[in-house]
């Protein structure tokens, strides 16, 4: 959404939907307002240096990297923005380049291409069928909930 200026906040789309995304699936984040990674410059630098990593990778690096130890809330965010290798995260930002997005471990989709393909003004929340027959699950405001499949919830 336009109100999010950093992946720090926009990545609610990642950690609030990860239990609803199929292994091998793809999450497309259309984020026209995103122009940086971190809300604070030092967190932005940390994300740019390490990218989004799995929990195991972060825990290993945390043992030896002073900058990670100095900013634990930023270090935790590196995991919040990770799919843990389960699915692909594709970002369509308004203010970050392809090189910047790919440098942190995400796939890049040009914003104009994303808007042309997915038409957020037309899509309805839930399942939508694209003109080419692809079925996509659209969530207009991923920051407003927590999504999961029955299989991922188990007996909870």
Where are these regions (language model features)?
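C-terminal catalytic subdomain
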Residues: 3-93
């Amino acid at each position: 959404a336009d109100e999010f200026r950093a992946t720090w906040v926009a990545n609610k789309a990642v950690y609030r939907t990860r239990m609803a995304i199929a292994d091998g699936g793809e999450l497309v984040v259309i984020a026209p307002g995103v122009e940086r990674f971190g809300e604070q410059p030092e967190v932005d630098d940390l994300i740019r240096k390490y990218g989004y990593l799995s929990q195991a990778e972060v825990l290993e690096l945390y043992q030896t990297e002073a900058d990670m130890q100095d900013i634990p809330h930023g270090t935790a965010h590196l995991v919040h923005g990770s799919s843990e290798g389960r699915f692909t995260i594709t970002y369509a930002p308004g203010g970050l380049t392809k090189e910047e997005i790919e440098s942190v471990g995400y796939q890049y989709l040009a914003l104009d291409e994303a808007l042309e393909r997915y038409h957020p003004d037309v899509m309805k929340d839930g399942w939508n069928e694209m003109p080419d027959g692809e079925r996509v699950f659209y969530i207009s405001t991923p920051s407003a909930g927590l999504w999961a499949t029955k299989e991922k919830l188990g007996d909870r």
